[in-house]
Amino acid sequence: MPELALLEEVVEKVRPLLGQGKVANYIPALASVDAGKLGIAVTTVDGETLGAGDYLEPFSIQSISKVFSLTLALTLYEEAEIWSRVGKEPSGHSFNSLVQVELERGKPRNPFINAGALVIADLLQSRLGAPKHRMLELVRQLSQNDKVCFDKQVADSEYQHSARNAAIAYLMKSFGNFQGDVDTVLRTYFHYCALKMNCADLSRAMLYLANRGKTVDGTELISQVQTRQLNALLATSGLYDGAGEFAYRVGMPGKSGVGGGIIAVIPGELSICVWSPELDENGNSLAGTAMLEHLSQRLGRSIF
């Protein structure tokens, strides 16, 4: 377990970077977030959580939710049913690209770009009676925090600016790779993105990725093999177009969101969440990436 002094050092080390990135502004409800926030939390495979900075302040998890939705799909579907509809390759295009959907005849490159996450949401919508409620149930169980909730203002804000995601969904539907009602699935998807959690919640919730599929309370959520495969996808496709840079600098499987959060995993040891709302040109937290880089160097850890 890293000591508290190390986590505090990591936070202070990156503080000079504040002001160099930009807060996401294409979702009005996210644009008003205090740009000066910095937080980090780690949870060990023994279930102990430690944090520094603004680690208890909730934020919008955005695309980090795509890890939860894929995990939920893995518990409900045969793997062939999932991977026949979404690929496992890095994208190389922007996370909300229509061009790629057209070129690949409606099959998204991976589950962590918008097109792929919409297919996963479509799968969940078709198999669950109440997909929003089931997701809330899952993340509350994983984080051991019953107060985790959806931010309705953020969900509504995203829905009001959903033309591009709707276009992606309809394009996939034209290729036969989208089954449900587009509007209904979009609302579910935006609720997932609008989950509000803090660094401590997320580091606990993601422990199964570091712990062979087992959650904080020891329950097996997904198999050991599925966990390894999910971490492989996170290592190659979890950071938008910055996955290579992140692998080079940090050396851990990870997933970012435009709310400024990044989760990362040291398999067999730790799950980590960092938060700083200012983003780099790839849409990843600028200071958050630097925190993870410094932590990995100080711990001497990398999956490579």
From Swiss-Prot:
Xref: InterPro entries: Beta-lactam/transpept-like, Glutaminase
An annotated GO BP: glutamate biosynthetic process
Enzyme class name: hydrolase
One Pfam family named in its UniProt record: Glutaminase
This protein's UniProt keywords: Hydrolase
Binding residue positions for substrate: S63, N114, E158, N165, Y189, Y240, V258
Gene3D superfamilies listed in its UniProt record: DD-peptidase/beta-lactamase superfamily
SUBUNIT field: Homotetramer.
Family indicated by similarity: Belongs to the glutaminase family.
Full protein name: Glutaminase
Native organism: Shewanella sp. (strain W3-18-1)
Taxonomy of the source species: Bacteria, Pseudomonadati, Pseudomonadota, Gammaproteobacteria, Alteromonadales
